[in-house]
Amino acid sequence: GYVVNASSENEHLVVNGMSNFARDGINANSAVLVEIKPSDYYVNSPLDGLNFQRMIEKKCYNVGKDYGVPVQRYIDFKNNQITKEIGKITPTIKPRYIYANINDILPKWINDSLKEAIEAFSLKINGFNCDDAILTIPETRSSSPIQIKRNEKYLATKYIYPIGEGAGFSGGIMTSAIDGIKCALKIIEEINRGE
């Protein structure tokens, strides 16, 4: 797989993982997500989650400037030191990457959660915590930081059906498709009842 730049705002940085059809790249990739609750970022606005996301994206951009993506070997992440050179795994991010200490970029509780998760995954997937594994940040768009309110009929207001990732009801292609199917079934149900 590959990690690609998925930034959508000037001077903000976002990455995402992908694979070509054959899935025969030199690396495998996976996203390790950390649960972030409103209590982790809420100040006084429904947009505080978006502001928290943007703060991380801006901080990552500032570390790399000109879209250099922060990367770090897992052993260096664990030892809280900047990576000086890559090991047996080469980052695939384009256009360029920059060695950084992720511990200095993300909040401590996120770093602690990532380390705990990577070690836990290694108990099920041998080598997941390989010293030379490359961490690439930030993948901040795995789910929406806001959620549009809707009722049991999937309506936000008459004829407006907020569904899928952008509306905050799913976190990927499959869950978006499922949410869309559920919404379509509700619409069909209403049409059949003459509503």
Where do the protein language model's features map onto the residues?
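An anion/pyrophosphate-binding glycine-rich loop and adjacent beta-alpha core
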Residues: 1-100
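Glycine- and aromatic-enriched mobile tails/lids
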Residues: 25, 42, 158-159, 166-169, ...
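Flexible, glycine-rich terminal cap/loop adjacent to redox cofactors
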Residues: 43-47, 166, 178
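Active-site-proximal substrate-binding core of FAD-dependent oxidoreductases
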Residues: 74-77, 154, 186-195
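Residue-level signal for secondary-structure boundary elements
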Residues: 82, 86, 122, 126-130, ...
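A glycine-rich dinucleotide-binding beta-alpha-beta segment and adjacent secondary-structure elements
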Residues: 97-170, 177
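A conserved FAD-binding loop/helix module that cradles the flavin
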Residues: 167-191
